């Protein structure tokens, strides 16, 4: 199914397509293929439908170890596509300090520190010159705010004043700087599969991540990009079920190549 125009998305209210809504027009099926989750374009005054020369930005979203890097690597050698990986190396080394590791070990103390730097570095990702017609980004400034800052606050790890300041800064960025995106690809993975993959790749900072953390991140992603009950999405959303093994995931990426890389498929209805 092709995406509706961004203008029509702005006019529609988000509708539930999450688990538990079976029988409704937006309910999810149990198949392995992709599904389109209708979203409200936001902010609505950034409709670029008639800007034919605009370069396109696609954000690959998902939980920790959901397969984002694999997806980006799959498309990295495609002509006219550039890839921006999440700037994790920066988060691991700020003048010799590792705020990512500090946050995982003591989120109450270091949550604001890390998320302040994440917001800065993701802003840099969004605003750096784009050289190719299509840019694929690992996550976005939106998920930094709507998923990871939100999780710290809801979990009681971030004081309300820190949350308010980060939120106000984020809102100012969105109002005054072009950080718009054209499509969000959500790699929908169960926390149990993410936990298995996380343990297999054995990254140092991730050794202390509990299953409960992955469940919390998963719930927020579902609220944001599937149910539409958290925050409005920044762009239309393509959901790909991503619990499969590597071979199957590569097949799904190939099957969805045109949907992910072709702007015309994002702007016109079925």
Swiss-Prot record:
The active site is at residue 138. Keywords: ATP-binding, DNA synthesis, Kinase, Mitochondrion, Nucleotide-binding, Transferase, Transit peptide. Found in most tissues; highly expressed in liver. SUPFAM superfamilies: P-loop containing nucleoside triphosphate hydrolases. The keyword Transferase applies. Residues 13-34 have a biased composition (Low complexity). ATP binds at residues 62-70. One of its GO terms (molecular function) is thymidine kinase activity. It catalyses: thymidine + ATP = dTMP + ADP + H(+); 2'-deoxycytidine + ATP = dCMP + ADP + H(+); 2'-deoxyuridine + ATP = dUMP + ADP + H(+). Residues 1-38 form a transit peptide. Residues 42-54 have a biased composition (Basic and acidic residues). It is an enzyme of class 2 (transferase). It holds the Pfam family dNK. InterPro entries: DCK/DGK, Deoxyribonucleoside_kinase, DNK_dom, P-loop_NTPase. Residues 1-54 are annotated as: Disordered. The keyword Kinase applies. Its main location: mitochondrion. One of its GO terms (cellular component) is mitochondrion. It is found in: Mitochondrion. Homodimer. PANTHER family: DEOXYNUCLEOSIDE KINASE (PTHR10513), THYMIDINE KINASE 2, MITOCHONDRIAL (PTHR10513:SF24). Phosphorylates thymidine, deoxycytidine, and deoxyuridine in the mitochondrial matrix. In non-replicating cells, where cytosolic dNTP synthesis is down-regulated, mtDNA synthesis depends solely on TK2 and DGUOK. This is Thymidine kinase 2, mitochondrial.
């Amino acid at each position: 199914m092709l995406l509706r125009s961004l203008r029509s998305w702005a006019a529609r209210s988000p509708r539930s397509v999450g688990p538990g809504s079976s029988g409704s027009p937006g309910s999810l099926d149990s198949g392995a293929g992709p599904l389109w989750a209708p979203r409200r374009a936001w902010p609505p005054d950034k409709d670029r439908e008639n800007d034919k020369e605009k370069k396109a930005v696609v954000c690959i979203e998902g939980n920790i170890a959901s397969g984002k890097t694999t997806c980006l690597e799959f498309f990295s050698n495609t002509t006219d596509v550039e890839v921006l990986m999440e700037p994790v190396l920066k988060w691991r080394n700020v003048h010799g300090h590792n705020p990512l590791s500090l946050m995982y070990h003591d989120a109450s103390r270091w949550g604001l520190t890390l998320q302040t730097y994440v917001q800065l570095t993701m802003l840099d990702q969004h605003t750096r010159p784009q050289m190719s017609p299509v840019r694929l980004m690992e996550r976005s400034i939106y998920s930094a705010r709507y998923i990871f800052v939100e999780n710290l606050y809801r979990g009681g790890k971030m004081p309300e004043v820190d949350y308010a300041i980060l939120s106000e800064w984020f809102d100012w960025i969105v109002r005054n700087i072009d950080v718009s995106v054209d499509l969000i690809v959500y790699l929908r993975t169960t926390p149990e599969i993410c936990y298995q993959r996380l343990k297999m790749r054995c990254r140092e900072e991730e050794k202390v991540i509990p299953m409960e953390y992955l469940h919390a991140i998963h719930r927020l992603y579902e609220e944001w990009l599937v149910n539409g009950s958290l925050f409005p999405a920044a762009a239309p959303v393509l959901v790909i079920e991503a619990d499969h093994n590597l071979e199957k995931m590569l097949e799904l990426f190939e099957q969805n190549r045109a949907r992910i890389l072709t702007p015309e498929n994002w702007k016109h209805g079925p």
